């Protein structure tokens, strides 16, 4: 009987320790179609979150990790994305009118039908971003600078010649 109690207590302690030690990974957040106008997401890890068709007008996403995020059809007019990491993000049909993308990393993002009128892209890295030819021309007309993280020249990442 004593051996049974000792074994049971040890088992309970191990189960409790395993439960306390287990840290579940964060699940991606769903912000689809939400009105997030002016919301401050600066410096946050938003990896794989979804902002499909969300209103992010004048929101602050500066220095945020947005890797793999869906911004499909989102309105980012006037948003601050300075220093944001948008690697492999879905940007198709997103509106970046007058957005600040200074030093942002957009490597591998899909943005074929994204719009960038009046966007500030100084130092932004567009390596392997799929864009429409007319969007590429528009961005090349204002492209300048070098991304401080990747060391890549904005004009070179856009193939501006």
What are these regions (language model features)?
Residues 2-8, 14-161:
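Tandem repeat scaffolds
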């Amino acid at each position: 009987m004593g051996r049974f109690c000792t074994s049971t207590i040890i088992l309970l302690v191990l189960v409790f320790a395993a439960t306390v030690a287990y840290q579940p990974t964060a699940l991606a957040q769903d912000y689809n179609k939400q009105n997030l106008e002016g919301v401050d997401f600066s410096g946050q890890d938003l990896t794989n979150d979804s902002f499909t068709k969300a209103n992010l007008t004048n929101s602050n996403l500066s220095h945020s990790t947005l890797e793999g995020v869906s911004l499909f059809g989102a309105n980012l007019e006037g948003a601050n994305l300075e220093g944001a990491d948008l690697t492999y993000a879905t940007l198709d049909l997103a509106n970046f009118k007058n957005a600040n993308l200074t030093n942002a990393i957009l490597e591998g993002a899909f943005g074929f039908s994204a719009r960038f009128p009046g966007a500030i892209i100084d130092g932004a890295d567009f390596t392997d971003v799929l864009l429409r030819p007319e969007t590429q021309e528009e961005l090349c007309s204002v492209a300048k600078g070098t991304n401080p993280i990747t060391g890549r020249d904005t004009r070179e990442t856009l193939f501006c010649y």
